[in-house]
UniProtKB/Swiss-Prot annotation:
EC annotation from Swiss-Prot or TrEMBL: 2.5.1.7
NCBIfam families membership: murA, PRK09369.1
Name the UniProt record assigns to this protein: UDP-N-acetylglucosamine 1-carboxyvinyltransferase
Residues forming the catalytic site: 122
Residue numbers of 2-(S-cysteinyl)pyruvic acid O-phosphothioketal PTMs: 122
CDD domains given in the database record: UdpNAET
Length: 425
């Protein structure tokens, strides 16, 4: 099993290219099933979850063409949904990826039936699919859950437009319902919708392909269904979580970084906390520069919340920052339970963290010490790498397969910035 070895103590300097967003590309790939002709998606990141989704689309019968080589900069993928014949998404392919449930809406809406195995993914608490099921039922779907599968069908041809109010904000639930409504008959209204940039990106992709969507990025989305979407091209937005991770890494190490072709407006909460920590930040229309040379960060308090609040996917990285910051920082996790599993590993490096329910109280220390640690989920993996960048000696991070689900060539990118980091098999 692969491991990553990090030798700490080197500030990060330079420019880094941010990949396409993992949490945007997965629903967008699913949305190509709604078209009646090939769709080209560009700025596709090379990630384990992306490859899994591609394999799922192939399993369903879709034609998939990798353009310019999957590992080339600016890569794109063309999906031809006209060959789809299969309606069952098997467990052996979905067991490692929760986003597989996003195939439910498009398959049901276009083909009248779908069976999707209950998904797997990061072990960071309960993320039930009941909101997906109830949302699709509001459009006329008949759904049962049995033998580990969500089985859905439409008894009267097409789904029918309807109104649905989410009990709790659900990003993937909003995306599933949005895709299904795009080709349902009539008008659908989605209330208490997720407002994340990735939801907006999906909506913009659907609109590019001929969907009629208004209100994406607000709590109320209105969709006027069309019979089928068209061929088209769409570029995935840059990954705001990868952007934030590199910014935090640079702030922790006392370095300087520049990023081009990013979306600063999607990172207001993160940039605000980095400024609070003492970083000097310059923001352009599509660029971010951060300078933390010669300074130790100050501890920050934060509470995770749905967008536009502080993203839960950046919580672990800021906990790593607080571990070496000056002062005491309080972190409250309100989105997922069990999302403090990285704490025990940070403690092995010498961090001082006290857990009280869903709150972590972090007393900053001057330095951490390298040690063997184990990744427990995707963002925890990133936090351990960040901690390793500032620890004395070597930090060896095991179970990094989590990392490859959401970060494209992170060790290569950090190496270009000056980090001493390598992958070991």
């Amino acid at each position: 099993m692969s491991k990553i070895v990090v030798a700490g103590g080197t500030p990060l300097y330079g420019d880094v290219r941010i990949s396409g967003a993992k949490n945007a590309v997965l629903p967008i790939l699913c949305a190509t099933l709604l078209a009646d002709a090939p769709v080209e998606i560009s700025n596709v990141p090379y990630l384990h979850d992306v490859i899994t989704m591609i394999n799922l689309l192939r399993e369903l019968g879709a034609g998939v063409t990798m353009n310019e080589g999957i590992e080339a900069k600016g890569r794109s993928i063309t999906i031809d949904p006209r060959w789809v014949r299969q309606r069952v998404v098997p467990y052996d392919l979905v067991k490692t990826m929760r986003a597989s449930v996003l195939l439910l809406g498009p398959l049901l809406a276009c083909y009248g039936a779908a069976e999707v195995a209950l998904p797997g993914g990061c072990a960071i608490g309960s993320r039930p699919v009941d909101q997906h099921i109830r949302g699709l039922q509001s459009l006329g779907a008949e759904i049962t859950v049995e033998n580990g599968y969500i089985k859905a069908s439409v008894s009267q041809g097409r789904l029918k437009g309807g109104r649905f109010v989410f009990d709790v904000v659900s990003v993937t639930g909003t995306e599933n319902l949005l895709m299904a409504a795009a080709v349902a008959q009539g008008t659908s209204v989605i209330e208490n919708a997720a407002m994340e940039p990735e939801v907006v990106d999906l909506a913009e992709c659907l609109i590019t392909l001929g969907a009629r969507v208004e209100g994406a990025g607000t709590p109320r989305i209105v969709v006027e269904g069309v019979e089928r979407l068209n061929s088209g091209q769409y570029a995935v937005l840059p990954d705001r979580i990868e952007t934030g991770t590199f910014l935090v890494a640079t702030a922790m190490t006392g370095g300087r970084i520049s990023m081009q072709q990013v979306r600063p407006q999607t990172l207001d909460a993160v940039l605000g906390k980095l400024t609070e920590a003492g970083a000097c930040i310059e923001i352009g229309a599509d660029s971010i520069r951060l300078d933390m040379q010669g300074r130790r960060p100050c501890s920050v308090n934060l509470t995770t919340a749905p967008y536009p609040g502080f993203p839960t996917d950046m919580q672990a990285q800021f906990m790593a920052l607080n571990c070496v910051a000056e002062g005491v920082g309080v972190i409250k996790e309100t989105i997922f339970e069990n999302r403090f599993m990285h704490v025990d590993e940070l403690l092995r490096l010498g961090a001082k963290i006290q857990i009280e329910g869903h709150t972590a109280i972090v007393q900053g220390v001057e330095r951490l010490s390298g040690a063997p640690v184990m990744a427990t989920d995707l963002r925890a993996s990133a936090s351990l790498i960040l901690a390793g960048l500032v620890a004395e000696g070597e930090t060896i991070i095991d179970r990094i397969y989590h990392l490859d689900r959401g970060y494209e060539n992170i060790e290569r990118k950090l190496g270009v910035l000056g980090a001493s980091i390598r992958r070991m098999t």
